[in-house]
Amino acid sequence: MQRSPLEKASVVSKLFFSWTRPILRKGYRQRLELSDIYQIPSVDSADNLSEKLEREWDRELASKKNPKLINALRRCFFWRFMFYGIFLYLGEVTKAVQPLLLGRIIASYDPDNKEERSIAIYLGIGLCLLFIVRTLLLHPAIFGLHHIGMQMRIAMFSLIYKKTLKLSSRVLDKISIGQLVSLLSNNLNKFDEGLALAHFVWIAPLQVALLMGLIWELLQASAFCGLGFLIVLALFQAGLGRMMMKYRDQRAGKISERLVITSEMIENIQSVKAYCWEEAMEKMIENLRQTELKLTRKAAYVRYFNSSAFFFSGFFVVFLSVLPYALIKGIILRKIFTTISFCIVLRMAVTRQFPWAVQTWYDSLGAINKIQDFLQKQEYKTLEYNLTTTEVVMENVTAFWEEGFGELFEKAKQNNNNRKTSNGDDSLFFSNFSLLGTPVLKDINFKIERGQLLAVAGSTGAGKTSLLMVIMGELEPSEGKIKHSGRISFCSQFSWIMPGTIKENIIFGVSYDEYRYRSVIKACQLEEDISKFAEKDNIVLGEGGITLSGGQRARISLARAVYKDADLYLLDSPFGYLDVLTEKEIFESCVCKLMANKTRILVTSKMEHLKKADKILILHEGSSYFYGTFSELQNLQPDFSSKLMGCDSFDQFSAERRNSILTETLHRFSLEGDAPVSWTETKKQSFKQTGEFGEKRKNSILNPINSIRKFSIVQKTPLQMNGIEEDSDEPLERRLSLVPDSEQGEAILPRISVISTGPTLQARRRQSVLNLMTHSVNQGQNIHRKTTASTRKVSLAPQANLTELDIYSRRLSQETGLEISEEINEEDLKECFFDDMESIPAVTTWNTYLRYITVHKSLIFVLIWCLVIFLAEVAASLVVLWLLGNTPLQDKGNSTHSRNNSYAVIITSTSSYYVFYIYVGVADTLLAMGFFRGLPLVHTLITVSKILHHKMLHSVLQAPMSTLNTLKAGGILNRFSKDIAILDDLLPLTIFDFIQLLLIVIGAIAVVAVLQPYIFVATVPVIVAFIMLRAYFLQTSQQLKQLESEGRSPIFTHLVTSLKGLWTLRAFGRQPYFETLFHKALNLHTANWFLYLSTLRWFQMRIEMIFVIFFIAVTFISILTTGEGEGRVGIILTLAMNIMSTLQWAVNSSIDVDSLMRSVSRVFKFIDMPTEGKPTKSTKPYKNGQLSKVMIIENSHVKKDDIWPSGGQMTVKDLTAKYTEGGNAILENISFSISPGQRVGLLGRTGSGKSTLLSAFLRLLNTEGEIQIDGVSWDSITLQQWRKAFGVIPQKVFIFSGTFRKNLDPYEQWSDQEIWKVADEVGLRSVIEQFPGKLDFVLVDGGCVLSHGHKQLMCLARSVLSKAKILLLDEPSAHLDPVTYQIIRRTLKQAFADCTVILCEHRIEAMLECQQFLVIEENKVRQYDSIQKLLNERSLFRQAISPSDRVKLFPHRNSSKCKSKPQIAALKEETEEEVQDTRL
């Protein structure tokens, strides 16, 4: 970054923001890069600001029992805040004084006041000076307040992040990750730009008092009639706002449903294509879209009328103020013009500025209180360690994850001791206490000496990870003692990679030792992987190590733990993603040899690991089931297998294990509906979601999907609703900002169940930060991100004498920005927090505008209505001229004095009724036209949005995977959420606003040109200057916004990265380093945002300066060229003020339109995506008929002669596959053939291309070569026909939000009887019957109420219903319990006995049933032989299989044609043989 010119800028340069000219000039000429951005001033650095606020907050904590964050902020920022507030007040006072001088100028042309004619020129100079002073006061004040708000946000950003790193794990389990992001985004955004409106809470009342005093001087008591009307108007608009919220509430659920389905479709687009569900998904989403649009139109109409009422209230404010006085005393023209000017300022203060200021304070104080509560949360407490001890001891340890259970436990235990039963059965205590809450660990005891290896085993949810957390101090025990030295190293179950190089991830801040580093690299089998990278171990890894395979990430995490020189190493299932050979080698070389002299605790379920452990601890439901050596364990083998492997009965697994204790969240998102009653705190806390048994817990704005959260961008709105706090809006040009906009907006995604069309369970686990820390993005689970946008409230036309601050305030109510929703993307935040710069130009092209307005055929009607708008505005102006020019009446007190000039109008009591009827008639006509004239345009543009959404959805569903693979899932979802929301809500009214403003300016200029042609000459260069200035600024501002958007991503990426690795951070003591990285990310964003604010203020000030110059010219031309008669001068000066304020607003509005049209450009880019190819070969005959008669089996009654495929024979010739067109080949020259009904197993190391081959079979990749099924080539039929030949059980399970029936049969082809029959076959009947509604039960959040095994059974049922002849299985047993795994094996043998099966699997016993094996290595086929040949050779399969399994295969060695029998024996049936529960 470059050094900022601000450091050397003069006072004048700072006052006029001239120091920004170099960046504006550079941005206009070329594309800006990050290196072009200026460094931030030292006063804005996150280090300085956070240190300052943290010091004051610590002082507050130390000095008071009830510390207040507002006091710490006051001591840091109050005086500067008030300093700029005084400037703002003085600027507003000048606006209130301007009508006085205008009235004096008009009065100086009264023939009765000729003595004042000589001072008219001085009055004009004074009026112009007021405009100049206002400009010099307002702009620095607004910028200063923005600057203070930015500093407050930065300081609190840092304070919250530091606190997050200190929070206890118990607290983290209560806080949603989205709540943390909400703290760092929408709550803090209230300070950034909304701070400029905060002062109006005291400025507006003073201004109203001043204005009412001035109007009283003119009109006496009738002045309060206008004020009363404004108050009634404010209440009326509040009523319309509530009506609008009602529609938005209804609409929010529909938007939520649509985005849930859309998100699931995008995240599982490969599965959608594999199942041929494109049409079903499109129909489902479009149906939801139709209902949503009905409510969108209603909300838009109410919002439109609300805005129209505000604009056209100007007629009635003046009318009600002037009429009573005119009826009683009569009124002169000077008073009319002066009253109009006063009423415009008064209306803005009463109906806009004061309500916004109150709302800003309400929201800001609410946000401060939330942050204050968060900063007082319980912190992580380090245990007191004995640095001299060499052993690890745990005595009688009991622990709870639920906060407060420890105290409750002690009390309950004491009561139990006081009421001991006669038989002294202590177990009764635990069974009774489980009614209140279940401890995650119960009475755990063990002792291991230095250098020993303790293996911890147990079923899912048994408390293995919790045991390690107790040792680390992350989980504070309720009772018992822990003893160890405190020098700990930790390897998490789910690998955590921080952004940085491989070396930085392994060293992790520890001093570098070359020999130790090389030894660790070798022991963890990383040498070969590192050698493949050009940068070796200096290659930079992205967030989460997204460029690495799961096995590579796991080995790097293990290497990090091993590299640290510690006394105790805690290894939480570190081998989960490794193939069997790599696992064996690492366990031997690393755990057993390299760490032989260290104390190790290894969580594992592998028998070979238990055999080599010095001590074994088996946990079951939190209790110590066994502790001892392996030889002692063998005596308990019959019962031991169920505790170690979780092989309980199916009913128990499905009913109880899914609803176990709280720590089951360490494995997956679970259901609490039928769990034991949980204890909850009675006091409601800001960041704790509690619930009672039988009640549904509150969910975050975005419902979690399968325990994987994604960031979301939500278009923000104002009124607090369902826990969504209101934000202050921002200039619309800043899209995807940290500072969201809002006014009278909506909560798009309320905390409701996303699907409400069927019964749902009563309770549901909420996703917490703890879940984020304990889940991996590589589990193949559904991920979800849901976004949407709100609507805005628009003033349809500006008022005369609007200042830039008025316009700014109105913009705060009109444009809607983006906030980060309460649920977070933990996989790839960049895709959600900014859109790729792509090829979209900085300024929207004319081609985009033309294409947009020609989408709908009703454009001609829109153009006609635009003409009506123009005619209405001109007619209004002409009526005013007619009233002023053709009513030569006399005053009561001057009836004998005639007027020589027709413009010197005096309204008397005799003529007042006549004028009254004319005025009311004109007002009613314009009001009616104003209420309805914009509706056709709004209606048409919403229809355009509907059409574009349909086209984009169809395009995405039909796009090839090679194209979709180049796009980020978050980027695609943003098109359907953020951009469609803009097209629905913002763009129609913004376009109408701009068209109306432009026509108002044209009409006013026409009137002025009639009255004074010289002014028209001055207007033309001003308009040209505005257009040129806009074009000059727009080029740079759009680029700065993009850079700011990109700079926002690392902040939230770093937050989630830190949370995911928080246990590792604490174990290694790396919190200060990560705080420094967070500050760097903040400073990067600040540099972009501060520069954008500065250039925006430069632009607004230049517009104001042009207006001042124009007004000076108009004032002196009017004064010097006008003869006697006050009417002409009043009209000219009033219209001149209206022209320039309107033109100023029109320029800003045009920038808004350009920004919004970028969303249209992005939508068009998706619509123009290529579609999947059609058959490239001519239709070939098939059997005795034509291929056109060939049918895919979709019905069991199809005649055998017509079905295809009939046998399932596959022939693959020279198959080459690529993920993207022009990319590297993932598979090269693959050739083999499969006989009908044969079972083929795919073998290969992690990343060898097994899953890729299955995708290539489905034509999901860019492929070359040929595949034939039963003689039919894939080039000769459509993709739909080809893919329906396959049944698929993918690695990534796809359960969309909908009923069981919809998930099994989205096309509604099968009857209930047939579905129940298949459900019975695959073991799903007992699962489905548990739920209310059975097949009509609505699954939400990716089927969160189902275990992973049940989801796999759903996929299996889909394949059975498809009656496909070829079945593709991609690691179906991954993360399955043994019971569900056995069900899948049984179903495969029964339902697919005559089908061709291609299996990619890690479990040895599953592969033993295959007759042929395809070994893939280095993207090519290395071997394709029967199991007998592979066993005779030194193949990968022979290395992986155990001798015991080879013995089982001997009976089949001589008959390769026979189908192998399943050779799986339960663990309890094996005595001395080694159990191979490992992966290939």
From Swiss-Prot:
Top-rank taxon, per record: Eukaryota
Impact reported for E826K: In thoracic sarcoidosis; uncertain significance; no effect on glycan maturation and channel activity
GO MF terms, alphabetically ordered: 14-3-3 protein binding; ABC-type transporter activity; ATP binding; ATP hydrolysis activity; ATPase-coupled inorganic anion transmembrane transporter activity; ATPase-coupled transmembrane transporter activity; bicarbonate transmembrane transporter activity; chloride channel activity
GO BP annotations listed: amelogenesis; bicarbonate transport; cellular response to cAMP; cellular response to forskolin; chloride transmembrane transport; cholesterol biosynthetic process; cholesterol transport; establishment of localization in cell
Effect of E822K: In CF; no effect on glycan maturation but decreased channel activity
Effect of D614G: In CF; impaired maturation of glycan chains
Resulting phenotype, S307N: In CBAVD and CF
Modification Phosphothreonine, positions: T717
Main location, first listed in the record: membrane
Domain spans labelled ABC transporter: 423-646, 1210-1443
Domain ABC transmembrane type-1 residue range list: 81-365, 859-1155
Residues bearing a lipid moiety (S-palmitoyl cysteine): C524, C1395
Impact noted for substituting R334W: In CF and CBAVD; mild; does not prevent maturation of glycans
PTM sites of type Phosphoserine: S549, S660, S670, S686, S700, S712, S737, S753, S768, S790, S795, S813, S1444, S1456
Disordered R region as annotated region, ranges: 654-831
PTM text: N-glycosylated.
Amino acids binding ATP 1: W401, S434, G458, S459, T460, G461, A462, G463, K464, T465, Q493
Result of changing L346P: In CF; dominant mutation but mild phenotype
Motif (PDZ-binding): 1478-1480
Record annotation: effect of changing C225R: In CF; uncertain significance
Consequence of changing N900D: Abolishes N-glycosylation, enhances endocytosis and impairs subsequent recycling to the cell surface
Family of the protein in this entry: Belongs to the ABC transporter superfamily. ABCC family. CFTR transporter (TC 3.A.1.202) subfamily.
UniProt free text on domains: Binds and hydrolyzes ATP via the two cytoplasmic ABC transporter nucleotide-binding domains. The two ATP-binding domains interact with each other, forming a head-to-tail dimer. Normal ATPase activity requires interaction between the two domains. The first ABC transporter nucleotide-binding domain has no ATPase activity by itself.
SUBUNIT field: Monomer; does not require oligomerization for channel activity. May form oligomers in the membrane. Interacts with SLC26A3, SLC26A6 and SHANK2. Interacts with NHERF1 and MYO6. Interacts (via C-terminus) with GOPC (via PDZ domain); this promotes CFTR internalization and thereby decreases channel activity. Interacts with SLC4A7 through NHERF1. Found in a complex with MYO5B and RAB11A. Interacts with ANO1. Interacts with SLC26A8. Interacts with AHCYL1; the interaction increases CFTR activity. Interacts with CSE1L.
The name this protein goes by in its record: Cystic fibrosis transmembrane conductance regulator
Record organism: Homo sapiens (Human)
